[in-house]
Design a protein with these regions (language model features):
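An amphipathic, aromatic/His-enriched active-site/gating alpha helix that lines ligand/cofactor pockets
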Residues: 24-38, 56-91, 146-155, 174-210
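Glycine-rich beta-strand-turn "strand-cap" elements at beta-sheet edges
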Residues: 42-49, 74-118, 158-167, 194-229
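N-terminal/domain-start segments enriched in small and hydrophobic, helix-friendly residues
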Residues: 7, 11-13, 20-26, 45, ...
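Surface-exposed interaction/gating patches
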Residues: 111-149
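Short, well-ordered beta-strand segments in beta-rich or mixed alpha/beta enzyme
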Residues: 2-9, 38-68, 120-127, 156-187
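Short structured motifs
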Residues: 37-38, 107-109, 141, 155-156
C-alpha cells in the first residue's frame, strides 16, 4: 500500500468551502479510481482550520493516476487560495496493519442522506531517533494489535512510515467516539508502549490533528478488522 498523510491549515472563514471541495475530490477518488481505497477527511475539534487527509492507494502508480484526474484538478483549483501556509505531505508505506487487512472504505448501499460524522480520529506525525526506528516500530505494532483486537471501540490503529525519511512515522487511529479513545488511554498496552518509547522521539512531536470525520460518514467501512500483523 501507499498512503498520503496530508495536513492543512485553512484561512479563517474558508474551512467550510474547503471541506465541500475536498468531499468532491474524495467521492471522485474512492468512487472512480480502482487504485484508491480511502480518502478520509478529518477536521480538528479544537481548531476547525486544521484539516487532514488520509489517502490510501494500491501503489505509487495509483497515486500518479489520482493526480491526473479531473476531480483532483477541480479541487486543487478551487482551494489553492484557501490554504494558509505550507501543506504537510508525507508519502508512506504501511507498517501496521499489513496488506491483507481491511483497507477499502467503500460500502454498498450507504445513504449519505442519513449520514453522521461522530468518529474520533487521530492523525499524528512521530519523529523518531534514527537508531531507534526499528525498536519503535516493534513497540507500536504491539500497541496496534492490542488496540484493534482488545478494544471494541478502536476501528483502526494504523502505523505508516515515510518512504523518503524512515525516521518519520505516522499514527492514524480511528475510534467510534471520544469515549472510546479515552478508554484506549487507560489500557495496559498503551501504557507499556508509552513507557517503552518515551525517550525515542527526535525532538518535540508536532501537534496532532484530533477530531471528527468530515467524509466519509460513519456508515462507510472504517474498520481494519482484527489484524495481527
Amino acid at each position: 500500500m501507499r498512503i498520503l498523510m496530508v495536513q492543512f491549515t485553512i484561512k479563517d472563514g474558508m474551512a467550510d468551502a474547503f471541506l465541500e471541495a475536498a468531499k468532491g475530490d474524495g467521492r471522485g477518488s474512492v468512487g472512480n479510481e480502482a487504485g484508491c481505497y480511502r480518502f478520509d477527511i478529518i477536521q480538528d475539534r479544537d481548531d476547525p482550520n486544521r484539516i487532514a487527509f488520509t489517502e490510501v492507494y494500491d501503489d505509487d502508480a495509483a497515486i500518479e493516476t489520482h493526480g491526473a484526474q479531473a476531480h483532483m484538478t477541480a479541487w486543487r483549483d478551487a482551494t489553492k487560495d484557501m490554504i494558509d501556509g505550507p501543506v504537510k505531505v508525507s508519502r508512506c508505506r504501511n507498517i501496521f496493519p499489513g496488506d491483507l487487512a481491511s483497507w477499502n472504505a467503500r460500502r454498498d448501499g450507504v445513504n449519505e442522506g442519513f449520514s453522521s460524522e461522530s468518529l474520533f480520529i487521530i492523525h499524528a506525525e512521530l519523529p523518531v531517533l534514527a537508531d531507534k526506528v526499528d525498536d519503535f516500530i516493534e513497540a507500536v505494532k504491539l500497541d496496534g494489535v492490542g488496540s484493534t483486537n482488545l478494544e471494541p471501540g478502536c476501528l483502526r490503529f494504523d502505523v505508516y512510515q515515510d518512504t523518503s525519511d524512515s525516521t518519520k512515522l505516522w499514527l492514524y487511529e480511528v475510534y467510534v467516539n471520544s469515549e472510546a479513545f479515552q478508554f484506549h488511554t487507560t489500557t495496559p498496552h498503551i501504557a507499556k508502549w508509552r513507557d517503552t518509547v518515551a525517550d525515542w522521539y527526535d525532538g518535540e512531536r508536532p501537534a496532532a490533528i484530533r477530531g471528527k470525520n468530515v467524509w466519509p460518514s460513519d456508515q462507510w467501512n472504517w474498520s481494519s478488522g482484527s489484524p495481527l500483523n
